[in-house]
Amino acid sequence: MQLTVVEASLQQVVLTAPLAPNINHRETVFGGSASAVAILAAWSMLHLGLAAEGLGSRLVIQRNTMDYLAPIDGNFTAVALAPARRAWESFTRMIRRKGLGRITQAAALHYQGQVAGALAGEFVAFGPGYA
């Protein structure tokens, strides 16, 4: 996939990937690659936030939807912004209380200045000691 991390902060995660290793038979980005890059951006955003709060956990994706809005036939980026404050507080509160939290995290695929894809992923964090 040849991903490159452009930014990884508590405000956003930005990943970029080239077309060549992610190409399909139509000479555009393979949908599976696009989805994987978006999921990784979303997962990384949550992982960074949990680490910053000292909430070591196992973070997994439970389900996702991916909307492909335009073909991508070149280098593209995936951007995940920090979750809304209220959603984040509820997520971390549940991890602290029950050792398990769920949150929906979005990521967008950008190509040539346009949004070319949108991910909505539901992630689950298992806190320390959760079996």
What are these model-derived regions, one by one?
Residues 1-3, 62-68, 90-92:
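Short structured motifs
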Residues 15, 62-64, 78, 103-105, ...:
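Hydrophobic residues positioned within well-ordered beta-strands of beta-sheet architectures
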Residues 17-19, 68, 82, 125:
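Hydrophobic residues in beta-strands and at strand termini
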